[in-house]
């Protein structure tokens, strides 16, 4: 059906797409998970209310989520070049993917943790659990299913973003789709 050259190109594109998607999701969770936990705990009905911290994080997350990815990708080119040394390719694409994914993840985590029954948290407090114990042994455990669903949604979102990155040389399947499917109109590769 396809020549060996096309198959090699597609396999390389799949590899680059997986590299960008998984790498950005992992680093996105490194940033977004603590942000989401902090937002939940510092909310007015959280276990350690702090309006100032919550408002700052809420504004950061809202701004981060409201910027369209393609615009963010272009805006972050200088930062990407400073961090990676170039602003194109699959490794360089991870930087804007992480910056875009982290606020999304933070909101997903916040939403998941807010679903935890307040009675369970109150029971842990009454038994003398510390804030860290409530977070790690009650909230994260009780929200486990919702958090896993959040990971799958995040992976799908980041995968879509990585395809968009191909429009400006981000590599992966998005790059192949633009170069061969759109510019050359080779429908068989699409």
Protein language model annotation of sequence segments:
Residues 6-10, 186-187:
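Primarily residues marking transmembrane-helix entry/exit sites
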Residues 1-8, 168:
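Short membrane-interfacial helix/loop motifs at transmembrane-helix boundaries
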Residues 113-143, 183:
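Short helix-to-coil transition segments within interhelical loops
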Residues 170-190:
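Interhelical loop and adjacent transmembrane-helix boundary motif
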Residues 9-114, 149-156:
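Membrane-water interface segments at the C-terminal ends of transmembrane alpha-helices
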Residues 91, 120, 131-133, 145, ...:
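Residue-level recognition of membrane-helix boundary sites in multi-pass small-molecule transporters
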Residues 131-162:
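Transmembrane alpha-helices
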């Amino acid at each position: 059906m396809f020549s060996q050259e096309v198959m090699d190109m597609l396999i390389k594109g799949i590899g680059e797409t997986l590299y960008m998607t998984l790498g950005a999701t992992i680093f996105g969770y490194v940033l977004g998970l603590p942000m989401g936990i902090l937002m939940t705990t510092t909310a007015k009905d959280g276990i350690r209310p702090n309006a100032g911290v919550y408002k700052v994080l809420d504004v950061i997350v809202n701004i981060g989520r409201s910027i369209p990815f393609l615009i963010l990708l272009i805006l972050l080119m200088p930062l990407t070049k400073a961090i990676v040394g170039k602003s194109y390719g699959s490794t360089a694409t991870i930087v804007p993917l992480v910056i875009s994914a982290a606020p999304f993840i933070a909101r997903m985590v916040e939403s998941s943790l807010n679903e935890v029954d307040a009675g369970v948290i109150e029971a842990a407090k009454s038994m003398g659990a510390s804030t860290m114990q409530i977070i790690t042994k009650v909230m994260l455990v009780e929200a486990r299913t919702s958090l896993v669903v959040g990971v799958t949604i995040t992976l799908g979102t980041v995968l879509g973003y990585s395809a968009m990155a191909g429009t400006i040389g981000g590599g992966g399947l998005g790059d192949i789709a633009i170069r061969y499917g759109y510019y050359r109109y080779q429908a068989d590769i699409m």
